[in-house]
Amino acid sequence: SECLVGSEMCIRDRAVTTIVSTDMAAPVAKKYGVELRRTLTGFKFIGEQIGKLEAEGRADRYIFGFEESYGYLSGAHVRDKDGVNATLLVCEAAAWYAQQGKTLLDAIEALYKEFGYYRNALCSFAFEGESGMHTMQNLMKNLRANAPAEIAGYKVESAVDYDTDGTGLPRANVLEYHLAGGHKLMIRPSGTEPKIKVYLSAVGESEAAADAVNAALSKAAAEIMKV
């Protein structure tokens, strides 16, 4: 984060990520005064945000975009993930920290100590056969009708239904549960395959603590999916 923005930070610079990407981006962006926008899953939506800034004559205010499935882009030169750009960013960061006698591992550990150990995981549940899609539809319908009060022992403090809640994003068949402790679980059926993806996000004072939360959330997700 320090390497990317450093002394070049300007008020209302914008970073963009997706709703299923790490929540660690929010406190980092807040520290540096960066506006963080979240989009639906898919780098094309990040590209749309660049286009909106360009239409406002503010394309230079876009500084970075990323998604959980390893897509990165700094600068507004393209509207898609850029592997070469990402590689150069890693090299630049490694060199920047090396000048301070640090490694990239030192840098990420410092971020964890400052903001908390954020750990993400993805569970995928298949619903095969002719009845698979129907089963998925019923499962999502039941979750909307009977919202859980707790998941894995963590109270559901708030829930977002991206299909109905007026999030400012295009409607999507996604349910998001914010849990006590800053943890999160999201449920998103695939639009092309008979499977449901469950995204887990945990934060703790150590890597082991966050991983333990995700392990509990994973078991709870399997129970919800009845797998």
Give residue ranges: language-model regions.
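Phosphate-binding and adjacent anionic-ligand microenvironments
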Residues: 12-188, 195-199, 206-213, 218-227
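Single conserved hydrophobic/aromatic residue that forms the stacking wall/gate
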Residues: 1-6, 10-11
